[in-house]
Amino acid sequence: MIKILIDCFGGDHSPEANVDGAIAALAKMPDLHLILTGDEASLQHCLQGKTYDTQRLEIVHAPEVIGCEERPIDVIRLKKESSMIKAVRMLRDCDDINAMVSTGSTGALVAAALTRIGRVKGVIRPAFCPILPTMDGGIVGICDSGANVEITPEHLRQFAIMSSLYMKHVYNIEKPRVALLNVGKEAEKGDEIRQKAHFLLSETPEIHFVGNMESRDLLSGRYDVVVCDGFSGNVLVKTTEGTALELLKKLKKDIYSRPIYKLGALLMKRMFMEEKEFMNYQNYGGSILLGTSKTVVKGHGSSKATAVEKCIEQAYRMETSSLSSKMEEIIMRYEHYEY
């Protein structure tokens, strides 16, 4: 049985979306056991009238909620009864609990995970790796996307190793193509950090490094993993998601601007619906925090039930892949760590 904690408060649609996503995940995965943390009365209210296996879902009362504007260091110290911190403590202390999912504050989650759960042996800094769809029907992982603003070339090599293993063992991509986000494709492009990182990645046989990537090629389908610092990665992901949403809005507005466009849209309704689903980030779950000793998945703050369900599925697949041991084995081959 795979046991996963769900932090049910802190997101824009909490706790309803978290509860509905949890119930949907239970229906799909018969060997899954979920533990919901949060205000018990609110969670019981959300569960009323819902059909689910009561033997595989439990509630742990946590009356406090962490706001996105609160300082991470403060909430770890002062909000020990919050849904997030209680989930992190349980993940650390209980050997039979495998993973946790949260749609709450990113800063608080990273700080709590690093100080309370710890890292895989040899990992310098854990990193987020969200998934986006590509134009050829595949997916691409972006690592890092927000955990580390300041990085070194060695950090980028570790991000590449971790995310490459993730794409291989969780998403079944046999030989993930790894690219380095840069301002140009030539090896000498970028600042000193990127130039040194390019050399390190080229000298790392455990990954299939294919060179630099410009941001415009992110969704081209030519890459399976893109490594970068957390600031650039976060901007890249959010710009891509935002552009897709705005294009859909413009398309809808244009369709309603003329009767003939409405007629054409009616004939192409099925295609438009498929494209809308393809570009909807809710269908791709959240960001796995690679490199922590236990699995942590961070969902969008705006996650609805579908996204929460996908986050749970990510955590489940991570646990069934035994990725942490594989990650430690490769990373420990390199001795020059920068702690």
Regions found by a protein language model. Give the residues of each.
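N-terminal phosphate-binding or glycine-rich loops at protein starts, especially the Walker A/P-loop
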Residues: M1-Q44
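Short, glycine-rich nucleotide/cofactor-binding loops
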Residues: I6-E16, I76, A147-R157, K298-S303
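Short glycine/serine/threonine-rich phosphate/pyrophosphate-binding segments
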Residues: S14-N18, E81-L91, A99-A113, I124-C129, ...
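Glycine-rich phosphate/diphosphate-binding loop of Rossmann-like nucleotide-binding domains
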Residues: E16-A17, M29, H33-I35, A41, ...
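Short, conserved active-site loop motifs that form the nucleotide-linked donor/cofactor pocket
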Residues: L32, R56-L57, V140, I207
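Phosphate/nucleotide-donor binding subsite
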Residues: T51-D96
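Glycine-rich phosphate/nucleotide-binding loop
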Residues: L114-F128, T134-I142, R222-V226, G230-Y339
